[in-house]
Amino acid sequence: MKFLNPTALIATLGLAATLPVLAATKAEQEAEYYPISTLPVPEGVVLEAGAIQVLPHQRIAVSTRLGEIWFVDNAFDKDPSKAKFSRFASGLHEVLGLTTRGDGWIYATQRGELTRIKDTNNDGRADLFETVADSWGINGDYHEYAFGSKFDRDGNIWVILCLTGSFTSENPYRGWALRITPEGKTIPTTSGLRSPGGIATNHLGDLFYTDNQGPWNGTCWLKHLKPGGFVGNPTGNRWYEKAANMGPRPKDPTSNSRIPIERAKIPEFVPPAIGFPYNKMGQSASGIQNDGTAGKFGPFQNQLFVGDQTWSTVMRVYLEQVNGVYQGACFPFREGFDSGTLSLELASDGTMFVGGTDRGWGARGGKPFALQRLNWSGKTPFEIHEMHVKPDGFELTFTEPVDPETAGKVESYQFRTFTYIYQANYGSPEVDATTPPIESVTVAADGRSVRLKTALNLGHLHELKPTGVRSKSGRPLLHPLAYYTLNEIPR
């Protein structure tokens, strides 16, 4: 993550009067489909929500960056003012993961350990704390965050560990993903992490995490945590000496290169699945949630939603596997949250809880913290639903039929590609930009999909702006923007 004061930037560009108005207009448009409601936090409570867990009986648990866990009753009530807060636990260390499995324990990922917590005398306060695993290191550096997953399909909790600062790994497994088994055994699983911001499974049960711009990360990414894989930053690879199950240490990448070039040299290299272009989609990718609500959150079943802490937004992600490798497209989804989006939790009834904080990096939302809800209104926005790669271009599907005249025009689409330098230095500008012409457009008979024939660039992000496309009823796209990350071309 890298702090950039958006207010100062706007003032520098001379857009202070116009940009907030435009942003408010977009948020108002989005609110027709996905309204935001705010749960009022009691005075004196600093609820920087690091993690959220849905509990039975309309209750949620919320952990804070100050080491507390709060219960929120009536969290789903139509009237958010009826929410009631009670402190369950305190004295913990920046809890960035919460999960349960119906046995009375709450599992909390702290900076230095995975802990399970219980209220044994039913007085509403935790009184039993047990260490499940503490096999990684911590030395007090601000950057040594630890994020924890929900239980995976095998009953494991995954812990993803930030590096020490941006450039070193001073303690065991900093820059790694670890699996903690139900018995408390630690299994080093994936190397090459830098600065995680969130972790979750997709609908197939595979684990993904967000990583942030910095050394070896030209931008913010969504990456697949493939067991045995290396995801790009070699700083923590010194700990292969402690991870016999992982095999030999991968070859170090060459700086000032490109990901496809280094991937060809390093068999363990798992390329980023999704790139979030810096200062276009956001600046600090954070929490992740899969939509498994069977339509209760709208038309995006089995897609992922990803927060951005600096921009106070939630983005949308469509993933596909091509030649066995994950890749796909990201889209804007919802802006206008009160603080920096950090934690997401999507309940089975279609309520998405969004926890916010601005400490450390600042946020557009403007408030130091917030706990909010996002719900689907029942109205379907006109959006690109999915973006599939084909051997000769892309296929777009839409949430409603398109107008064949506007959707069938080449002029309705703007298209370019670019990539990032893969380097040890911090971040990267966009490089190697191309503007391949769209050779032809074919609209399906039912109007639900469009085929774009165009050249593809391996390892590039493909930026598509279908600003001229209208729905059959004449509506423009709510978000006429997509970025497809191309790791593989279909054979």
Language model features with spans:
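Beta-propeller domains with acidic blade repeats across secreted/periplasmic ectodomains
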Residues: 24-381, 385-393, 404
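Bacterial N-terminal signal peptides
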Residues: 7-20
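Flexible, low-complexity linkers/stalks enriched in Thr/Pro that connect modular domains
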Residues: 484-491
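Positively charged n-region of N-terminal signal peptides that target proteins for export
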Residues: 1-6
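Surface-exposed, short loops/turns at beta-strand junctions within beta-sandwich domains
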Residues: 455-461
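Short, surface-exposed alpha-helix to beta-strand junction/turn motifs within ectodomains of secreted
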Residues: 396-440, 464-471, 480-484
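Structural beta-strand segments of beta-rich domains
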Residues: 392-396, 450
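Blade-terminus and WD-like Trp-Asp/Gly-His loop motifs, strongest in beta-propeller folds
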Residues: 442-446
